[in-house]
Amino acid sequence: MNNSLIVRQLGLQDYQEIWHKMQDFTDTRNAETQDEIWLVQHYPVFTQGQAGKPEHLLQRSEIPVVQSDRGGQITYHAPGQQVMYVLIDIKRHKNLNVRQLVTALEQTVVKTLAEYGIESYPKPDAPGVYVDGKKICSLGLRIRRGCSFHGLALNINMDLNPFHYINPCGYAGLEMCQLADFVNQDEADWDNVSAKLIKHFADLLGYNITTL
């Protein structure tokens, strides 16, 4: 297995632009293409997954709504949220299927939050990561030609109010939370969190990291 993982820090980006770049990367990659993680924040946007239903958008606003090709229902992205896109060739990994990749992503977040003294957990019937019943991390993937794209969105220090305009991930009344609810502002640091996410994901899947 090629165990190299390229990590790209992309900063603040338009959702649709990055989405189409993920599609292009996945469509043109071959057996020699190294796996990559893209770390990004997005301008405010609601995204509907393939299972998304219009009724889960409760209130229209100036925030755009984009129909995406990832799994899952509607969610919200905005600055202050760490989005980690996972572009990997699942076929390279022995005994790794889509469900196990989802589990690895959830455990990446659980282990990251544990470093801040936060006890979090996944739910078997609702992908993502939760703290005291509130959702702190959303997750949705797309698999094409045995390769993944899309990934996870971990709330760090953002305006959570627009989540009230939707049923997050299709669940009415689901409350959202973020890292800044549990630690001081200095600890809710973008670079610190992203470094921990990368480390734990790489450790779980046996990668060597190259940061670009």
From Swiss-Prot:
<dbReference type="InterPro" id="IPR000544">
    <property type="entry name" value="Octanoyltransferase"/>
</dbReference>
<keyword id="KW-0012">Acyltransferase</keyword>
<comment type="similarity">
    <text>Belongs to the LipB family.</text>
</comment>
<dbReference type="InterPro" id="IPR004143">
    <property type="entry name" value="BPL_LPL_catalytic"/>
</dbReference>
<feature type="site" description="Lowers pKa of active site Cys">
    <location>
        <position position="135"/>
    </location>
</feature>
<comment type="pathway">
    <text>Protein modification; protein lipoylation via endogenous pathway; protein N(6)-(lipoyl)lysine from octanoyl-[acyl-carrier-protein]: step 1/2.</text>
</comment>
<protein>
    <recommendedName>
        <fullName>Octanoyltransferase</fullName>
        <ecNumber>2.3.1.181</ecNumber>
    </recommendedName>
</protein>
<dbReference type="GO" id="GO:0036211">
    <property type="term" value="P:protein modification process"/>
</dbReference>
<feature type="domain" description="BPL/LPL catalytic">
    <location>
        <begin position="31"/>
        <end position="209"/>
    </location>
</feature>
<dbReference type="InterPro" id="IPR045864">
    <property type="entry name" value="aa-tRNA-synth_II/BPL/LPL"/>
</dbReference>
<dbReference type="InterPro" id="IPR020605">
    <property type="entry name" value="Octanoyltransferase_CS"/>
</dbReference>
<dbReference type="GO" id="GO:0033819">
    <property type="term" value="F:lipoyl(octanoyl) transferase activity"/>
</dbReference>
<feature type="binding site">
    <location>
        <begin position="151"/>
        <end position="153"/>
    </location>
    <ligand>
        <name>substrate</name>
    </ligand>
</feature>
<keyword id="KW-0808">Transferase</keyword>
<feature type="binding site">
    <location>
        <begin position="138"/>
        <end position="140"/>
    </location>
    <ligand>
        <name>substrate</name>
    </ligand>
</feature>
<feature type="active site" description="Acyl-thioester intermediate">
    <location>
        <position position="169"/>
    </location>
</feature>
<dbReference type="GO" id="GO:0005737">
    <property type="term" value="C:cytoplasm"/>
</dbReference>
<feature type="binding site">
    <location>
        <begin position="70"/>
        <end position="77"/>
    </location>
    <ligand>
        <name>substrate</name>
    </ligand>
</feature>
<dbReference type="Pfam" id="PF21948">
    <property type="entry name" value="LplA-B_cat"/>
</dbReference>
<comment type="function">
    <text>Catalyzes the transfer of endogenously produced octanoic acid from octanoyl-acyl-carrier-protein onto the lipoyl domains of lipoate-dependent enzymes. Lipoyl-ACP can also act as a substrate although octanoyl-ACP is likely to be the physiological substrate.</text>
</comment>
<keyword id="KW-0963">Cytoplasm</keyword>
